[in-house]
């Protein structure tokens, strides 16, 4: 459970890092994580035939940047996140470590991005970090290549 809490801490760090004016300082950690929890009923009410909401795109970016940050902490390999989304909610996220692609996910219907619970959020984040870390361990020469 400690690793899950570590991921949630990394996620909160990313959310707060995107707040250049300090508007989120008044919110608790649980309030900042609440938008990441979207129940199945809530998900059904979200239309996918409209433009992507800026807040949803920011949450998606924060999540994958937290995965990259946690991977970097776990392995010491410098990571870079690339998120490409179109206005309709389709796109791709790629996380690199050196020259190694450690995560490559196709995204669709991101208007409905969220998790059923904060535990599921933490578990998904940790699973992605673990998978990326294993790739970096296996291909460490490529992951640490900065040329």
Swiss-Prot record:
UniProt cross-references to InterPro entries, sorted A to Z: NifX-assoc_nitrogen_fix (IPR004952)
Gene3D superfamilies listed in its UniProt record: Protein of unknown function DUF269
Keywords linked to the UniProt accession: Nitrogen fixation
A family per Pfam: DUF269
Superkingdom of the source species: Bacteria
A Gene Ontology biological process term: nitrogen fixation
Family according to the record: Belongs to the UPF0460 family.
Protein's recorded name: UPF0460 protein in nifX-nifW intergenic region
Source organism (scientific name): Frankia alni
């Amino acid at each position: 459970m400690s690793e899950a809490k570590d991921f949630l801490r990394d996620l909160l760090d990313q959310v707060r890092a995107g707040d250049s004016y300090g508007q989120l300082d008044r919110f608790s950690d649980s309030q900042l994580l609440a938008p990441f929890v979207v129940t199945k009923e809530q998900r059904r009410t979200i239309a996918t035939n409209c433009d992507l909401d800026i807040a949803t795109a920011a949450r998606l970016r924060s999540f994958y940047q937290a995965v990259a940050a946690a991977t970097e902490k776990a392995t010491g390999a410098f990571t870079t996140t690339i998120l490409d989304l179109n206005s309709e909610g389709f796109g791709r996220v790629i996380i690199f470590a050196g020259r190694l692609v450690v995560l490559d996910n196709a995204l669709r219907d991101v208007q409905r991005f969220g998790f059923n619970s904060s535990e599921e959020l933490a578990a998904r984040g940790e699973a992605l970090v673990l998978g990326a870390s294993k790739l970096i361990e296996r291909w460490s020469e490529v992951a640490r290549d900065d040329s």
